[in-house]
Amino acid sequence: MGRIHATGARKKYVHRDNLDIASFGERPRAWLLEHDFIPQELRQSWISITEQALQGVRHCYERAGDLRLLRLHGDCHTGNLLWTDQGPHFVDFDDSRMGPAIQDLWMLLSGDRAEMSRQLTDVLAGYESFFEFDQRELYLLEALRTLRLLHYSAWLAMRWEDPAFPMAFPWFNTVRYWQDRILELREQVALMDEPPLWPI
């Protein structure tokens, strides 16, 4: 990933959106509300927690300061990482856009806070062999996770009239789905108030 980012930092995209609070948070939230996807009995709770979540995201961005944006993979999780005898290969670049480098690193981490700190240490050791990482970006880790939650719900909702989507995602657009998202966002609000994850 360090090599990909070293290349990605050379030029900017002209025709792709940035990964930012507006495109991944504010606009998806507005779309879901305008199209009445939130069950009426949960609507006020969802409105309230998404407002709090976006305030938390903005605060994380303020703490991080002015950061370099580069061309990202954009959806870098282990399902998009294939290992061969020649090493790792990244696939599925259709979500590539401009954004902070941490977007392509945080989804590689899993487990509790201590485990993620250890994993982050290993990831950055390899990454910085090829490209420098600005540690201020660690303030964005939970903010980007929060934006992904909002964006993904809207992404599914925007495609819900496609007959393939209800078959592929039967759990979406149920009361239980939105209850779970409200709980997740409450957890994210708390996590964004904590000190950033740090390599050990």
Please identify what each model-predicted range represents:
Residues 22-32, 128-134, 171-188:
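Short, mixed-charge aromatic SLiMs
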Residues 1-45, 69, 168-169:
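A cross-family kinase active-site recognition segment
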Residues 45-60:
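Mechanochemical coupling/switch segment within NTP-driven translocation systems
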Residues 4, 58-105, 200:
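Active-site acidic catalytic loop and adjacent metal/ATP-binding pocket
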Residues 22-25, 144-154:
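Hydrophobic alpha-helical segments that form the core
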Residues 101-132, 148-164:
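Active-site activation/catalytic loop segments of kinase-like enzymes and analogous catalytic loops
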Residues 36-37, 154-200:
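ATP/Mg2+ or Mg2+-diphosphate-binding catalytic cores
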